[in-house]
Regions:
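Structural motif
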Residues: 146, 464-466, 500
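Metal-dependent nuclease catalytic cores in nucleic-acid-processing enzymes
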Residues: 176-183, 337-345, 433-437, 482-502
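Conserved catalytic cores of phosphodiester-cleaving nucleases, focusing on short active-site segments
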Residues: 432, 455-472, 486
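Phosphate-binding site recognition
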Residues: 1-424, 440
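Active-site metal-binding core of divalent-cation-utilizing nuclease and nuclease-like domains
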Residues: 137-141, 435-462, 507
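Mg2+/Mn2+-dependent nuclease catalytic core
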Residues: 167-171, 472-489
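Domain-level recognition of nuclease-like catalytic cores that cleave nucleotide substrates
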Residues: 491, 495-520
């Protein structure tokens, strides 16, 4: 079988089909949404999750390009293939702009649509210009108009927490969107995508009938790649990757799941893989970090500081009601909506009696990428050496040589300059938490948890489970005694693996960082 051509970086459905590149069939969702009640639809998904390709697929469908859908699910579902005029607005380039720049940008993208339909206008107000365009296209073609808006929130993301700038840009965008309400009779379908959810009142003040399908089960798999799609549409890709990695098909599927799976956008929900990472993985023939490398989480780190959200908090399950994470980011009072809507945490469960959702990191790619990005903020110029230390520690941990592993860690800690920080203990608690969490990059299962003045950690390798208690300014003996007294290791008696108990203590002696340990 000829090797698939993967559409890395290609977001145009027509090009993918004409160039015979691989396409995960999402057309059943297209048919479902276009044949249900409602005219206005909104979908929120993290970046690099296939939103732009979905919008492009809608465009080809509404333009009646039946030949592009040959062999896809919708070919058997759709009987009419009526062609409609489509206005496609991509707002992804409308970032980092002042009010005047944004206004010019909106006029420019309207002009491009005017040129497509040979409609001339010299109006300078974006709302009047768009209103005229919808009316002119409807009259000219004799059909209702389809409006597709990709990344509706792009102009607002940078200023979501700068009230004065946000108000200015939000008013501009509200003005731009206002004709969508007044021309309802001329519109066949309106679809908008974005990353974050801005309050409906602030952006679409008059558009009160948008159907938000972001957390609806019928559309849970509309973006991303579900496990079923992976196993049925990419089966040969799995086999080829397994051959490259010199491991079994089953081992490869498990590795793909641990690295790229784990997303859920409602509950219950199918397992959803990150499409960008999965396609890059198959194209390269190796499992690596892809999605995280496409965006710098500086903004996220700043927000973590603002809301006093620690790295250790990311490792815990967050229990919240729907309104506390599926909420407008510009009015958020915690960091949870930003974490969820950006794809750093996802739904992992739901408790029906309390109506509380469990949110957590989706997979290893996010865990390692996020903690790897946080490490330089705690170790500054020592982060590269820390990564080397973690890599070398992983080899020793897998061998079961814990004395050597902790000697290596202690040698590194001694090189980090002492800083008379008012929260020195808290700083190092988070630093060590991150370093242990990053061992997951080397096939070591790490579950660290924090409490006041200590960290408890379990590490699992192929043949052993290590139960560790890390204290600060106490003693390793005291840490080990706590493991014994509280029977922490009992939970792993039936694992069939050797269970090793380790007490750790971090302290500062003569302004030098020191780690001591005792293995029970």
């Amino acid at each position: 079988m000829a090797r698939k051509l993967y559409p890395i970086g290609i977001q145009t459905f027509e090009r993918i089909r004409k160039e015979d590149k691989f396409y995960v069939d999402k057309t059943e969702y297209i048919y479902r949404m276009t044949h249900t009640d409602g005219t206005y639809f909104f979908l929120s998904r993290p970046r690099r999750f296939g939103k732009s390709l979905l919008v492009s697929t809608f465009q080809s469908y509404f333009e009646g390009k039946k030949e592009l859908f040959e062999g896809l699910a919708i070919e058997k579902l759709e009987k009419e293939w009526t062609a409609y005029p489509v206005l496609h607005f991509d707002l992804s380039k409308g970032k980092h702009m002042e009010k005047e720049q944004l206004n010019r940008y909106l006029l420019d993208i309207i002009e491009k649509q005017e040129a497509r339909f040979d409609c001339k206008s010299n109006k300078i107000d974006v709302n009047i210009r768009l209103d005229d365009l919808i009316n002119a296209v409807c009259r000219k073609t004799g059909r209702q108009v389809v409006v597709l808006i990709d990344e509706y929130d792009a102009p607002l993301l940078d200023v979501a927490h700068e009230k004065e700038k946000l108000d200015d840009l939000r008013n501009t965008m509200r003005n731009f969107y206002s004709p969508l309400k007044g021309n309802e009779s001329m519109l066949r379908f309106v679809f908008m995508t974005g990353i974050t959810k801005f309050s409906q009142l602030s952006i679409f003040s008059e558009l009160n009938n948008i159907k938000n399908v972001s957390m609806k089960l019928p559309y849970a798999g509309i973006c991303g790649i579900t496990k079923e799609e992976l196993l049925t549409q990419m089966s040969d890709d799995i086999d080829e990757l397994a051959e490259n990695l010199e491991q079994s098909r089953e081992e490869t599927i498990e590795e793909l799941k641990s690295h790229y799976d784990g997303y859920h956008f409602c509950w219950p929900s199918p397992d959803v893989f990150n499409p960008y990472s999965l396609l890059n993985c198959f194209a390269d023939g190796e499992i690596d970090s892809y999605w995280f490398g496409t965006g710098t989480p500086t903004y996220l780190i700043n927000m973590m500081r603002k809301y006093d959200f620690l790295p250790a908090d990311l490792g815990e399950t967050i229990e919240v009601g729907k309104k506390d994470f599926d909420a407008p980011t510009e009015t958020m009072t915690t960091i949870v909506p930003l974490l969820y809507q950006s794809g750093y945490v996802t739904i992992k469960g739901y408790d029906k009696p309390t109506k509380l959702y469990q949110l957590a990191l989706p997979n290893q790619e996010i865990r390692v990428g996020l903690y790897g990005s946080l490490l330089p903020h705690y170790l500054t110029d020592k982060s590269a050496k820390a990564n080397t230390t973690i890599a070398k520690m992983s080899v020793l941990v897998k061998k079961g040589d814990m004395d050597a592993a902790f000697c290596l860690l202690n040698d590194f800690l001694e090189t980090v300059p002492y800083c008379d920080n008012t929260n020195y203990e808290g700083h190092w608690q988070q630093t060590l938490y991150i370093m242990f969490a990053l061992l997951t990059n080397y096939s070591i299962l790490v579950e660290p948890h924090t409490a006041k003045g200590r960290i408890d950690i379990t590490m699992e390798t192929a043949d052993a489970i290590y139960v560790m208690e890390l204290k600060f300014n106490k003693s390793a003996e005291e840490a080990l005694a706590q493991i014994e007294a509280r029977h922490y290791a009992d939970a792993f008696k039936m694992s069939g693996k050797k269970v090793v108990k380790i007490g750790l203590n971090f302290s500062v002696k003569d302004e030098v960082n020191c780690l001591e340990w005792k293995i029970g």
